[in-house]
């Protein structure tokens, strides 16, 4: 049996020697050694990546949910909105850098270095006594989150095309189980113990993960990718350093500006926000022009990717927009739970459990739909149905009000059911259409575009909500107070207190009674209901885009083959040139004949 290599991969102008070695390193599932996927190096590496993914998203979600308690300990800060933003920005930059660099220098050094950086960040976090120190820790942890965000690549490239999702599912299974629990555990640790244990847990898990990586994870090395005639110094000279500087600066400035904007102390028209967004956007425009017209030898984002409109471009659009729709769910739904159902929930634990139902839905969808992906086939129709499903249930989420709590739980689960599955599919599909020597760079563009697009639409979602709520509140409050005897002259004071969202401020007003307070609480919940409905209408409108993109996408079923792009090697064989015939994994006769002709 010969190696199955897709013939129509995106041509990113690879060197002939690199293309030949990529084909030599590839194999098919049938040609792998017996028991390969049960070998210690595979089991240990998969366990390490699984542990890293769990630790990575646990520290983010748990610390974000415990942020009010953390601020009580280290002191309040006007930069509290940056806590998660710096993490997200760090991960986006890390994944984008990972793409081209690991294609050229190998995955192993990047994975080990980012794990070590994560340990340093967690140590800084667990010892922090000032909030700015915590921000530095979250930045380091965000950059260290690159391997977790790139796990569909690192695991997918070790599996055959038709079993990539099963491999990813094995690694993601613990994440599915813990994803919804992380916010709850973060609050419980902060309330009943110490929030610093969030970072301690990360340190424990990440230490085990990096130990397993160092011992067992040996993907193709620099020598295997390029042979022994090419030096790392020569490759470093070809790195697109100008592109790296431009994309890091542009992405960081733009994401910070978008995330900061709309805050009470940073309105959208403030000089700080306008300056960050405009300078970031301008830098990214310069980056794009440089990549197209500067013609770097190893561009960070090859312009030729975008020539494949029915393949790469459609995948990129679907991933970015559905990721943004996912954000509308995971950001807005927990706020809905607090603002609409807060008065009817018994305690913070019940609130935390109800807020996690959307996450439980995403986990269930990954397990159920991911297991069937390669069996159902008809890839673009699967994505089309998923996009229509998500759009329909996001629209249904607009019907949530204070009288249908059970419906809210059910709808949040059903809405989340397809969203993580759809995002994972796009990050696997991009590996189908790319030649094996360029898997990282194509994957990185798709993976990094999600947080970038997500930050833009998140700002838009929040802007829709914050602009709508005061108007809805004035209407509902005025209607609810008729006949209650509340003084008309005090209405403006009541309106301002209600805008804060705090019932303590409402109850502190002169002349406030228990009955009127209850009426105000219900009016506030109804105002929140109407405001969030507009956000879901917006998200539902976005759903038309991935629906159209999935219809335009070409049929990719032909790529569901036994082709395996890369393998893990024994340590003693990890630096041997496969074309010299002394590697543990021998190239196929076809590949050797190609090498002889050269």
Curated annotation (Swiss-Prot):
InterPro entries attached to this UniProt entry: MFS_dom, MFS_Str1/Tri12-like, MFS_trans_sf, MFS_Tri12-like
Induction details: Expression is positively regulated by the trichothecene cluster-specific transcription activator TRI10.
GO cellular component term of the entry, any: plasma membrane
Subcellular location: Cell membrane
Keywords: Cell membrane, Glycoprotein, Membrane, Transmembrane, Transmembrane helix, Transport, Virulence
Glycosylated residues, chain numbering: 79, 161
Chain segments annotated as transmembrane: 42-62, 109-129, 135-155, 165-185, 197-217, 241-261, 273-293, 312-332, 356-376, 381-401, 409-429, 442-462, 533-553
Region spans: Disordered: 579-598
Role noted for this protein: Efflux pump that provides the dual role of trichothecene export and self-protection by allowing the fungus to evade the harmful effect of its own trichothecene production.
Protein's name according to its UniProt entry: Trichothecene efflux pump TRI12
């Amino acid at each position: 049996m010969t190696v199955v290599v897709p013939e129509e991969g995106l041509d990113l102008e690879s060197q002939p020697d690199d293309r030949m070695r990529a084909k030599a390193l590839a194999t098919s599932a049938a040609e792998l050694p017996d028991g390969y996927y049960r070998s210690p190096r595979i089991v240990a590496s998969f366990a390490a990546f699984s542990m890293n993914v769990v630790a990575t998203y646990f520290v983010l979600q748990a610390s974000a949910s415990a942020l009010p308690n953390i601020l009580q300990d280290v002191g309040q800060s006007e930069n509290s909105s940056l806590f998660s933003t710096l993490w997200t920005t760090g991960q986006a930059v890390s994944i984008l850098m990972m793409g081209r660099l690991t294609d050229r220098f190998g995955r192993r050094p990047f994975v080990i270095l980012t794990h070590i950086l994560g340990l340093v960040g967690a140590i800084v976090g667990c010892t922090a006594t000032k909030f700015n120190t915590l921000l530095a820790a979250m930045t380091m942890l965000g950059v260290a989150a690159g391997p977790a965000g790139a796990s569909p690549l690192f695991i997918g490239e070790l599996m055959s095309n038709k079993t990539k999702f099963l491999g990813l599912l094995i690694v993601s299974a613990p994440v599915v189980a813990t994803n919804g629990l992380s916010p709850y555990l973060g609050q419980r640790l902060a309330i009943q113990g110490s929030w610093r244990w969030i970072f301690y847990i990360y340190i424990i898990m990440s230490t085990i993960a990096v130990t397993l990586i160092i011992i067992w994870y040996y993907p193709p090395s620099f020598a295997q990718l390029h042979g022994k005639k090419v030096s790392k110094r020569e490759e470093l000279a070809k790195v697109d350093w100008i592109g790296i500087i431009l994309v890091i600066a542009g992405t960081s400035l733009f994401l910070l500006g978008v995330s900061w904007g709309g805050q009470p102390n940073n309105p959208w028209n403030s000089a700080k926000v306008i300056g960050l967004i405009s300078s970031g956007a301008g830098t990214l425009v310069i980056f794009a022009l440089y990549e197209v017209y500067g013609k770097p030898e190893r561009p960070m984002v090859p312009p030729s990717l975008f020539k494949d409109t029915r393949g790469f471009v459609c995948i990129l659009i679907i991933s970015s927009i559905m990721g943004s729709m996912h954000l509308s769910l995971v950001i807005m739904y927990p706020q809905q739970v607090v603002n609409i159902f807060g008065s009817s929930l018994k305690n913070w634990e019940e609130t935390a459990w109800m807020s996690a139902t959307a996450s439980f839905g995403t986990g269930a969808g990954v397990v159920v739909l991911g297991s069937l992906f390669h069996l159902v086939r008809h890839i673009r129709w699967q994505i089309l149905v998923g996009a229509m499903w998500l759009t329909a249930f996001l629209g249904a989420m607009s019907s949530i009000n204070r009288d249908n709590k059970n419906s809210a739980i059910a709808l949040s689960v059903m809405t989340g059911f397809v969203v993580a599955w759809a995002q994972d599919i796009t990050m696997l599909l991009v590996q189908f259409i790319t030649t094996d020597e360029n898997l990282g760079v194509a994957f990185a563009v798709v993976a990094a575009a999600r947080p970038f697009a997500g930050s833009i639409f998140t700002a838009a979602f929040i802007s829709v909500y914050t602009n709508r709520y005061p108007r809805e509140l004035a209407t509902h409050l005025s209607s609810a107070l008729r006949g209650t005897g509340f003084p008309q002259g005090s209405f403006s004071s009541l309106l301002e207190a209600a805008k804060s969202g705090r019932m303590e401020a409402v109850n502190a007003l002169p002349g406030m009674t228990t009955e009127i307070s209850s009426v105000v609480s219900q009016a506030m919940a109804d105002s929140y209901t109407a405001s969030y409905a507009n956000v879901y209408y917006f998200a539902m409108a976005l759903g038309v885009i991935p629906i159209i993109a999935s219809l335009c996408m070409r049929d990719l079923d032909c790529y569901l083959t036994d082709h395996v792009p890369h393998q893990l090697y024994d340590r003693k064989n990890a630096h041997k040139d496969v074309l010299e015939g002394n590697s543990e994994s021998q190239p196929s006769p076809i590949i050797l004949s190609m090498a002889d002709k050269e």
